[in-house]
Amino acid sequence: MTNIRKTHPLLKIVNSSFIDLPAPSSLSSWWNFGSLLGVCLAVQILTGLFLAMHYTSDTATAFNSVTHICRDVNYGWVLRYLHANGASMFFICLYLHVGRGLYYGSYTYSETWNVGILLLFAVMATAFMGYVLPWGQMSFWGATVITNLLSAIPYIGTDLVQWIWGGFSVDKATLTRFFAFHFLLPFVVTALVMVHLLFLHETGSNNPTGIPSDSDMIPFHPYYTIKDILGFLMMLTALSTLVLFSPDLLGDPDNYTPANPLSTPPHIKPEWYFLFAYAILRSIPNKLGGVLALVLSILILAIVPMLHMSKQRSMMFRPLSQCLFWLLVAVLFTLTWIGGQPVEHPYIIIGQMASVLYFLIILVFMPLISIVENRLLNW
């Protein structure tokens, strides 16, 4: 008799996606981050659901409701810190996942890549709105500064900002709508994940060599399920350690002060995972120019497939491109550090140099070095 997993209308979808799925035999641990992101999303939706049961999206009570969750709700502090640090884990996995795609040339699957970019924007929007909800000082001022950037859009900017705020400043209407969207967006992200997987399974996975692996495939289960479970355990161990030993390591102390529109914090900055983009924004003295650079710092991923000049797909056998890739990683770390520093000498000039280098590496150096490598191999 045929196995039920191969005949049942629902189970056969699961079977063809996670059990009998043909996968390249050479996938390294860099291919674990897709499944880790799935676990992160599940953790965020579950903890967020329970937090939403106790949270109130009103400026008068939001800060106190978060305090109430931490002090009075059974294991509320675990939920709150799992959710806050889970976001950090989410972004660590996201950036490593995108980095893997850049290194191994996975961006040549353009549909999967473009849906991935949409996912990145959706997750960033969700995280930004979530940061506003505790209604601490950094929540309030972060929301004010970042939403105010839209006023740089010519003609409609000011009206657009007031429309998003629901008034003439960040207030109760803003908090309520941010909570509504923060609750809704993870489900949009989940739907996009399904589209992402649908496109991926149309083409099959890439592999470290970048060479078609149709002749050497193995079933996803048990080989990659067991490998993914090891990844889950390692990530959840790291997350638990962070939550139980130093839950505020990645947060901002200013957010333990209730929001006060009359007192500006000495240094307004977003969460650590947005600092690289924030540094690029600040490095341009013009407001509209800064906003464009901020958007382009992520949107540049969409034109990476067009800039692929190499005859090889992966960077595995391209040492010159590898050097440039790791230089790009170093530049991103530098930008993250600069984004957390005050706007003063020498941080301003370092930020400007790193921002220029970031765009130069992706737009100019990578394509040029690929052409050089082709010539060296007489291609």
UniProtKB/Swiss-Prot annotation:
GO BP term, pick one: mitochondrial electron transport, ubiquinol to cytochrome c
Cofactor note: Binds 2 heme b groups non-covalently.
Location of this chain's protein in the cell: Mitochondrion inner membrane
Domain of life of the source: Eukaryota
Record key words, sorted: Electron transport, Heme, Iron, Membrane, Metal-binding, Mitochondrion, Mitochondrion inner membrane, Respiratory chain, Transmembrane, Transmembrane helix, Transport, Ubiquinone
GO molecular function terms attached to this record: metal ion binding; ubiquinol-cytochrome-c reductase activity
Binding-site list for heme b b562: 83, 182
Needed cofactors: heme b
Ranges that cross the membrane: 33-53, 77-98, 113-133, 178-198, 226-246, 288-308, 320-340, 347-367
Membrane topology recorded in Swiss-Prot or TrEMBL: Multi-pass membrane protein
GO CC annotation: mitochondrial inner membrane; respiratory chain complex III
Binding annotation for a ubiquinone: 201
Annotated SUPFAM superfamilies: a domain/subunit of cytochrome bc1 complex (Ubiquinol-cytochrome c reductase) (SSF81648), Transmembrane di-heme cytochromes (SSF81342)
Binding site for heme b b566: 97, 196
Subunit relationships: The cytochrome bc1 complex contains 11 subunits: 3 respiratory subunits (MT-CYB, CYC1 and UQCRFS1), 2 core proteins (UQCRC1 and UQCRC2) and 6 low-molecular weight proteins (UQCRH/QCR6, UQCRB/QCR7, UQCRQ/QCR8, UQCR10/QCR9, UQCR11/QCR10 and a cleavage product of UQCRFS1). This cytochrome bc1 complex then forms a dimer.
The family this protein is said to belong to: Belongs to the cytochrome b family.
Function: Component of the ubiquinol-cytochrome c reductase complex (complex III or cytochrome b-c1 complex) that is part of the mitochondrial respiratory chain. The b-c1 complex mediates electron transfer from ubiquinol to cytochrome c. Contributes to the generation of a proton gradient across the mitochondrial membrane that is then used for ATP synthesis.
Misc. comment: Heme 1 (or BL or b562) is low-potential and absorbs at about 562 nm, and heme 2 (or BH or b566) is high-potential and absorbs at about 566 nm.
Protein name, per record: Cytochrome b
Source organism of this protein record: Carollia subrufa
